Amino acid sequence: MHDQGEFLSCDWGTSSFRLKLVKIAGLEIIAESSTTNGIARTYELWKRMNEPEENRFAFYARNISHQIEKISQQTGRSMDNIPVIISGMASSNIGMIELPYKKIPFKLNGSDLLMQRYAATENFKHDVLIISGISGDQDVMRGEETQITGIENIPSGDWICILPGTHSKHVKVKNGLVVDFKTFMTGEFFELLSTKSILAGSIEKGADPANKNNLSAFEKGIRAGIESNLLHSSFIARTNILFNKLSRQENYYWLSGLLIGAELTELTHLHEYNIVIVGNQEQLLSYKAAFEILNQLAKTPIPVLQDSDKAIIRGQSRAMMNQKK
């Protein structure tokens, strides 16, 4: 890939697209653009075009070009010949090109991840590097593997990396290798329960998670998630309102805490592991609060927190360096 001193970092998820112009020295973000045109929506648009399969890559590349043009306008200069590094769902069966998963174990430095390079063309003047996902016996991920390889100050010994989200990941690391991971549908369950179930009328999103009452409700939900059966305790979100125990906004945070607590129950016995959480600010605050309660109840270690946006950029930069070797 051409070494321009910069690269375009593309994090293309199922429901979101984020593009950043990154200076390689110091990994400084120079400009950025984002849209809700995730892979799922882009794939739907592609299917409507009814074009031959061999045109799919070019169609997706045109969508990237629209966002590159916004970066060009922000910076006042051409982005031609600056490489594009893509992680996320672009390598899935609804993405630009389907790439196989890398079977675990894989190295934390990302040197054995599966990646595919595409040379610049007349119509898309950027070398492209697409990073594929990883798979275990029962689980898969696309995108999180790049965050894992971008973790700073990697703990020594055995440790667990938690990546919160729609489908949270708990990743086990031994001797510099990812050896196992599990998927927890925490975010998706919250979405379903709060919008599609009988609980929907009992929930109202609060504007301030740091509000004293909201935080108290969240912590109570965490304890309930750790200590009780989820299939029973989730119904309490309804009786919280029927019996005037919580407001609808407080109940929103109670239910969120309940599901996070249920997810993290898996970790109550892992006292010998260091724990790293990689997420956005809201996720880090929520999971930090949950682990403080876990520490009180089960002596689970307090985790180290790392920003997911920075981890993505570091992981993509390392992938680009590995590709040059």
Label the model's feature ranges:
Residues 38-52, 132-223:
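Glycine-rich phosphate-binding loop plus the immediately following alpha-helix
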Residues 78-90, 165, 260, 272-281:
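Short glycine-rich phosphate-binding loop at a beta-alpha junction
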Residues 16, 273-291, 309:
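Glycine-rich phosphate-binding loops at beta-strand->alpha-helix junctions
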Residues 223-266:
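Adenine-nucleotide phosphate-binding core of ATP-dependent small-molecule kinases
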Residues 10-16, 89, 162-167, 186, ...:
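A short acidic Gly-Thr/Ser loop motif
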Residues 7, 14-55:
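Short glycine-rich, Thr/Ser-proximal phosphate-binding strand/loop in the N-terminal lobe
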Residues 265, 302-325:
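Glycine-rich phosphate-binding/hydrolytic loop that grips phosphoryl groups
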Residues 48-53, 69-115, 129-137:
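Short beta-strand-loop/turn "lid" adjacent to the catalytic site in phosphate-handling enzymes
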